[in-house]
């Protein structure tokens, strides 16, 4: 039941993400890593399934990642942990496919709630790469303004040397955009017992 810190385990986490491809930002190492301090995210491997726990919000877990039999075993372990510790069992990052699978395993036992505020924006690669068309005009303007304001910008791979700077940049962005004042920032799509 030991929970590990996310950083330094990218290879392991990416291995599990590759087993269950998803378009969710919650299923990318960069996103999990950058938000791991804010939400106190820890991970564990339970029954050969990857599980994330948001320690800042009680016992809330991301839907496990792995092969179906491993996911079911991990879910049962998580439910047991919550029962032993006397807390409500809740999941986030539950896709319609995940919920269908749970309905198969546990008919009528769970309900799902959609939280629009936590939905991902999904763009087609080509449209985002070219930013062509009227719909993406605003994004083109933002990028052009950024390039004017920061002519020395560059891309960098995440490394030991720049990891703290990345966290500080993300925290600075959150502070300047009022995210710390928003009580809803820890809200997710939850799956709970009815």
What are these regions (language model features)?
Residues 2-10, 189-194:
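Conserved small/polar residues in nucleotide/adenosyl-binding loops
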Residues 13:
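Ligand/cofactor-recognition surfaces for anionic moieties
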Residues 17-20, 78-86, 150, 170-174:
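Hydrophobic, Leu/Ile/Phe/Ala-enriched alpha-helical segments that form helix-helix packing faces
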Residues 20-39, 153-191:
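A conserved beta-strand-loop-helix scaffold within acyl/acetyltransferase catalytic domains
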Residues 26-97:
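Conserved donor-binding loop and adjoining core beta-sheet/short helix segment
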Residues 74-76, 104-109:
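Short acidic (Asp/Glu) patches
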Residues 88-105, 116-120:
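Short, glycine/charge-rich beta-strand/loop segments that flank catalytic centers
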Residues 107-180:
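Acyltransferase donor/substrate-recognition loop-hinge adjacent to the catalytic core
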């Amino acid at each position: 039941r030991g929970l590990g810190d996310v950083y330094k385990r990218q290879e392991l986490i990416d291995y599990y993400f590759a087993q269950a491809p998803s378009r969710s930002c919650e299923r990318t190492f960069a996103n999990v890593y950058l938000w791991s301090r804010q939400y106190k995210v820890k991970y564990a491997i339970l029954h050969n399934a990857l599980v994330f726990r948001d320690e800042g919000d009680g016992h809330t877990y991301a839907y496990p990642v792995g092969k179906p039999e491993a996911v079911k075993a991990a879910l049962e372990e998580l439910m047991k942990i919550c029962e032993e510790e006397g807390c409500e069992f809740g999941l986030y990052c539950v896709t319609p496919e995940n919920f269908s699978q749970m309905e198969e395993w546990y008919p009528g036992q769970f309900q799902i709630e959609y939280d629009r505020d936590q939905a991902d924006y999904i763009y087609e690669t080509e449209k985002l790469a070219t930013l062509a068309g009227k719909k993406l005009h605003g994004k083109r303007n933002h990028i052009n303004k950024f390039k004017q304001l920061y002519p020395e910008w560059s891309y960098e791979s995440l490394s030991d040397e720049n990891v703290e700077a990345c966290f500080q940049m993300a925290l600075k962005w959150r502070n300047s955009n009022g995210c710390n004042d928003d009580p809803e920032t820890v809200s997710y799509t939850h799956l709970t017992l009815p």
